[in-house]
């Protein structure tokens, strides 16, 4: 909490400008391209991280596909995860976020500007609808982030089981899967300190459709989970 307050304080001048601009970008009639909207948000996020006393170490950026129409599956450690992704991925990302967070100040406008989706984790029909929409949009050339654990891990760098249902969107889109390992992403907001923190984000080699075409969603989920877990163990 102390770091969040510090980040807000360090960006008091810029915050109203960001909120106004991103709110306008979230409107349906906005004329900015998807890349332009994303780049603006990424610049904002990079400043927030820099002035929030966090060093973001990025590895494996060369594994991010140069062509749109892919999905990113990271482990989930907390609120800082999306900041790390927006600050490190040059391709425009949309995200599936829990419904409870979709109404937070600034978050709701960022979601609108990135054309992201909120999902009710207690409503099976809503989950099916969102997963189906993600698959359609990725197939049409958009990029999405889904946290397959369903909720954040409360055990630091340990990761939870990946829910196989989220990978139905992959089967529908027939797209590259980019596993992402987040390391110490829980620390900036969970540790009640303003000491400088180091967060690592590792983009792993993409898993192409040819590799998973004959697999069940449960097998794909386990494969992605294991590759991320192995990368974390190797790096800490």
Go through the PLM ranges and name each one.
Residues 45, 116-120, 151-152:
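Short, basic, glycine/proline-bearing loop/turn elements
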């Amino acid at each position: 909490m102390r770091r969040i307050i510090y980040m807000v304080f360090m960006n008091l001048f810029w915050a109203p400008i960001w909120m106004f601009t991103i709110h306008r970008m979230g409107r349906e009639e906005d004329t900015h391209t998807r890349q332009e909207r994303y780049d603006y948000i990424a610049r904002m996020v990079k400043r927030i991280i820099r002035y929030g006393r966090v060093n973001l170490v990025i590895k494996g950026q060369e594994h991010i596909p140069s062509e749109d129409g892919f999905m990113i599956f990271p482990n989930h450690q907390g609120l800082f995860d999306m900041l790390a992704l927006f600050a490190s991925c040059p391709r425009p990302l949309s995200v599936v976020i829990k419904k409870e967070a979709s109404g937070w100040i600034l978050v709701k406008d960022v979601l609108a500007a990135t054309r992201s989706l909120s999902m009710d984790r207690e409503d099976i029909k809503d989950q099916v609808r969102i997963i189906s929409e993600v698959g359609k949009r990725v197939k049409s050339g958009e990029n999405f982030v889904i946290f397959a654990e369903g909720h954040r891990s409360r055990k630091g760098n340990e990761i939870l089981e990946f829910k196989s249902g989220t990978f139905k969107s992959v089967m529908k889109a027939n797209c590259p899967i980019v596993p992402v390992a987040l390391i110490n992403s829980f620390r900036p907001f969970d540790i009640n300190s303003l000491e400088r923190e180091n967060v690592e984000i590792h983009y792993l080699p993409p898993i192409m459709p040819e590799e998973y075409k004959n697999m069940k969603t449960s097998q794909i989920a386990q494969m992605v989970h294991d590759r991320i877990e192995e990368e974390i163990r190797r790096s800490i």
